[in-house]
């Protein structure tokens, strides 16, 4: 099936395994050139090599912590213009809300909401100027049906979902 995205450029976060890797492989199969990132260099390099050998697309990899400004800057510098942004991050640990500190909340919001917002801010204007862009935020089914022990994740991911629903109306 032709998705009309062949030759486009995607930045896929947390792409060495799981949903991020699945997205990277599906995009590569559709002919999209990739920049993939993850924290562990060996894992992301191995993933890039495997995708590169299987599909006829360009695959750049960078080991970085996308939740830091330095990590985001490095990923964006490596990627060049981004046509497709896949925001993806692992979730915070489960637990009981009475046990979570303010720092736990800040860390969850930073990883699962604010990082994605910063990446959107860094890419959306170029997408608009090129009259093409796709932003996919991988969150959780818990944004529709919250799970009590996943309060940190519920809050951060619902925040991102609500933010994006608002800006989509711009």
Where are these regions (language model features)?
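Catalytic loop of short-chain dehydrogenase/reductase
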Residues: 136-159, 164-169
């Amino acid at each position: 099936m032709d998705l009309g995205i062949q030759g486009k450029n995607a930045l896929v976060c947390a792409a060495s395994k799981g949903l991020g890797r699945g997205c990277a492989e599906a995009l590569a199969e559709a002919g999209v050139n990739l920049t993939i990132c993850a924290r562990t260099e060996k894992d992301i390099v191995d993933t890039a090599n495997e995708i590169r050998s299987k599909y006829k697309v360009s695959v750049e990899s960078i080991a970085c912590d996308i939740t830091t400004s330095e990590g985001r800057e490095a990923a964006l510098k490596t990627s060049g213009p981004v046509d497709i942004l896949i925001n993806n991050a692992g979730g915070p640990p489960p637990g009981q809300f009475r046990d979570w500190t303010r720092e736990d909340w800040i860390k969850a919001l930073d990883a699962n909401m604010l990082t994605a917002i910063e990446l959107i801010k860094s890419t959306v204007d170029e997408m608009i100027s090129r009259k093409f862009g796709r932003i996919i935020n991988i969150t959780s089914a818990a944004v529709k049906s919250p799970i009590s022990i996943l309060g940190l994740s519920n809050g951060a991911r619902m925040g991102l979902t609500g933010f994006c629903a608002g800006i989509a109306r711009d």
